[in-house]
Amino acid sequence: MAAKIRKGDKVIVLTGRDKGRTGEVFEVRPDAGTALVRGINLVKRHQKQTQNQEGGIITKEAPIHLSNVAYVGKDGKPTRIGFKVQADGKKVRVAKSSGVEIDG
């Protein structure tokens, strides 16, 4: 399946404790259907001390399912994403609400 949400996209969280917050996607995991969004879904993890790293409790982003985030368009509103094939055969992402091309 083609990736509707990609690295670098600005997204808004639709459900959960971070509902309504926006952030930038910095990693997408297509096999799991999840993404990591900067500053969203933060969890605390106990880190064991190593030679390179100090031990203690660290805060990091946990994966969030792609169905729980929506792309934020140029107008600042969440929108669904579709695909359109251009005349030269190139496939581009399109915002469903406005019809504006996202990339390409």
UniProtKB/Swiss-Prot annotation:
Biological process annotations from GO: translation
GO molecular function, one term: rRNA binding
GO cellular component: ribonucleoprotein complex; ribosome
Domain of life (superkingdom): Bacteria
Pfam families: KOW, ribosomal_L24
PROSITE patterns linked to this entry: RIBOSOMAL_L24
UniProt keyword list: Ribonucleoprotein, Ribosomal protein, RNA-binding, rRNA-binding
Function summary: One of two assembly initiator proteins, it binds directly to the 5'-end of the 23S rRNA, where it nucleates assembly of the 50S subunit. One of the proteins that surrounds the polypeptide exit tunnel on the outside of the subunit.
Record text on subunit structure and interactions: Part of the 50S ribosomal subunit.
HAMAP family: Ribosomal_uL24_B
Family: Belongs to the universal ribosomal protein uL24 family.
Name used for this protein in its record: Large ribosomal subunit protein uL24
Species of the source: Bradyrhizobium sp. (strain BTAi1 / ATCC BAA-1182)
